[in-house]
């Protein structure tokens, strides 16, 4: 599959003409392979996914949207997935989801940045995706923590990995292992 964009300004009117032309050109070069692009806008604002064969979306319910509100993740994502599928009638892949976690921070009840919160966040996302038969794939963001430019929102890098930068597992890694074992 050709993935030709990640989080473009797909709510802008100019994006419609641009991506229509780009996808036509790609289909001339390779008519066999499906085309996709990854969106981060609301479905109501999207102007380009009709040109793709598969809809890909990055979603961070419980993190960038409704941070700390674990109970809103499942209903928010499920509603969002259904809207995308109803609008375009195409398979959907959730290409990014997750929450930052400080390795070793354990809190009950789970609070943002705790390992328990990351685990629950991933589980709530998985529950919503599992109930939508048109969801054909998912990708947790990210495999491992990584360094980014310093900023007030990023202390010592991106911490959304289910493994640390040193490749040590966080609590969520064990939950994912169990999820994948059940799929075999």
Where are these regions (language model features)?
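Substrate-binding clefts and catalytic carboxylate motifs of secreted carbohydrate-active enzymes
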Residues: 2, 16-28, 36, 44-184
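Short intrinsically disordered, low-complexity coil segments enriched in acidic
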Residues: 1-7
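Short, small-residue-enriched loops and turns at beta-alpha junctions
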Residues: 7-11, 43-45
